[in-house]
C-alpha cells in the first residue's frame, strides 16, 4: 500500500458530482448475500447502455466530425487518466489489427504513460500542463482530433488537453459521466454518459467505465466504417497478423467471392495479405497494381471501386 503524503492537498469538494454520490440501492452492500450482490450489479449494469443511447446524437456528431478530419490526413487521440485513459489506450490498440490502420492514426495517451497501464499515476492527472505536454510530445496538431475522457469531468490533465486542442484549432471532444453544469469542459462536441451513482461510491471503473468502453467501441468502429474499412458487416481491412485473423480473412473471401481456403491463401499471397485488394482483384479480374489503383481513386472504398469495374460480391 502506498504511503500517505501529508503534503498532498485535496481537490475542491467533488461531492456534488453525479459519479461521487451515494447509490441508495447499495447502502447495505457489505451485508448482502453473494447472489444478491451479483444480481444487483447485473441490474445496475443495464444503465450504461441506456446512457450511451441517450448520448447517441452527440456520438454521431463526433463520428462525422472525426471522419472528415481523418479523411483529410488528421489523426484521432484519446486522452485520459486512470480507467478513462486505459480504456482509450485499449480502443486505440485494437484498431490496427481490426482495420489494418496505421498505429499513428488512432492513439491513446495516458497520464503517466505505459507504466500507468499497470500502476496508478499519482499526481500526474492533477496537472493541466501535463495533458498539454503529452499531446505536444505526440505531435498533436491542428488537423487532429482529441477525445478527452474524464468520468467525473474534473481531471486537470484532461481539461488541459482539451484546452490545448481548442487553442490550436484541433477538434476537441469531451466525454464525461456527469451533467455539463456540474463539470463544464472546453470542447466542440460534448458527450455525456449519465450512468448515475456507482454501487461502490465513486468507483467510476464500474458503470461509468462500462459506458465509456461502449461509447469508444461505437466511435472508433463507426469512424472506420465511414473511412471504407468495412464492407457490409465484414472487416475487409483486417490485418492477417495471426492464425485466427488469417482464418477470418479466408472466411471473408469465401463468403464474398466463393473461393475455398487454398485459393484464398493464394489470393492473400498475391495481395500482400490485403483482403480488400484480394476481393477486388478476384471480383473484377484485375492485377494487384490495377486493383490498388482503382482503390486509390475511390479513397480506399471497396463498394464504389467494385461499381466502377462493374463487379459484384455475394449478397450478405
Swiss-Prot record:
Give the reaction(s) catalysed: N-acetyl-D-muramate 6-phosphate + H2O = N-acetyl-D-glucosamine 6-phosphate + (R)-lactate
CDD domains, A to Z: SIS_Etherase
Q: Which residues carry out catalysis?
A: 94 (proton donor), 125
* Chain residue ranges for the region called Disordered: 1-23
State the Gene Ontology terms under molecular function: carbohydrate derivative binding; carbon-oxygen lyase activity; ether hydrolase activity
- EC number(s) stated in the UniProt entry for this protein: 4.2.1.126
Q: Which residues form the SIS domain?
A: 66-229
Something else the entry says is: A lyase-type mechanism (elimination/hydration) is suggested for the cleavage of the lactyl ether bond of MurNAc 6-phosphate, with the formation of an alpha,beta-unsaturated aldehyde intermediate with (E)-stereochemistry, followed by the syn addition of water to give product.
Indicate the family of this protein: Belongs to the GCKR-like family. MurNAc-6-P etherase subfamily.
What name appears for this protein in its UniProt entry? N-acetylmuramic acid 6-phosphate etherase
Q: Which species is the source of this protein?
A: Synechococcus sp. (strain CC9902)
Give the lineage.
Bacteria, Bacillati, Cyanobacteriota, Cyanophyceae, Synechococcales
Q: Which gene encodes it?
A: murQ
Amino acid at each position: 500500500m502506498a504511503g500517505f503524503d501529508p503534503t498532498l492537498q485535496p481537490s475542491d469538494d467533488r461531492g456534488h458530482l453525479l459519479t461521487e454520490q451515494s447509490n441508495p440501492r447499495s447502502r447495505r452492500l457489505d451485508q448482502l448475500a453473494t447472489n444478491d450482490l451479483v444480481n444487483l450489479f447485473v441490474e445496475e449494469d443495464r444503465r450504461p447502455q441506456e446512457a450511451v443511447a441517450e448520448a447517441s446524437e452527440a456520438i454521431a456528431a463526433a463520428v462525422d466530425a472525426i471522419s472528415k478530419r481523418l479523411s483529410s490526413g488528421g489523426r484521432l487521440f484519446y486522452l485520459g487518466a486512470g480507467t478513462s485513459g486505459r480504456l482509450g489506450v485499449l480502443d486505440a490498440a485494437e484498431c490496427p489489427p481490426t482495420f489494418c490502420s496505421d498505429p499513428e492514426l488512432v492513439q491513446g495517451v495516458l497520464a503517466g504513460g505505459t507504466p500507468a497501464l499497470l500502476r496508478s499515476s499519482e499526481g500526474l492527472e492533477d496537472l493541466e500542463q501535463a495533458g498539454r505536454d503529452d499531446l505536444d510530445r505526440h505531435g498533436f496538431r491542428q488537423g487532429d482530433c482529441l477525445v478527452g475522457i474524464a468520468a467525473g469531468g474534473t481531471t486537470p490533465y484532461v481539461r488541459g488537453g482539451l484546452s490545448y486542442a481548442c487553442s490550436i484549432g484541433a477538434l476537441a471532444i469531451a466525454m464525461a459521466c456527469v451533467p455539463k453544469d456540474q463539470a463544464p469542459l472546453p470542447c466542440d462536441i460534448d458527450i455525456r454518459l449519465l450512468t448515475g451513482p456507482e454501487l461502490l461510491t465513486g468507483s467510476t471503473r464500474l458503470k461509468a467505465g462500462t459506458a465509456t468502453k461502449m461509447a469508444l467501441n461505437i466511435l472508433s468502429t463507426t469512424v472506420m466504417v465511414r473511412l471504407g474499412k468495412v464492407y457490409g458487416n465484414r472487416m475487409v481491412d483486417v490485418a492477417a497478423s495471426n492464425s485466427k485473423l488469417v482464418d477470418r480473412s479466408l472466411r471473408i473471401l469465401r463468403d464474398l467471392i466463393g473461393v475455398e481456403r487454398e485459393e484464398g491463401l493464394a489470393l492473400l499471397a498475391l495481395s500482400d495479405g490485403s483482403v480488400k485488394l484480394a476481393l477486388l482483384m478476384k471480383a473484377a479480374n484485375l492485377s494487384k497494381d490495377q486493383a490498388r489503383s482503382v482503390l486509390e481513386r475511390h479513397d480506399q472504398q471497396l463498394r464504389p471501386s467494385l461499381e466502377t469495374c462493374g463487379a459484384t460480391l455475394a449478397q450478405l
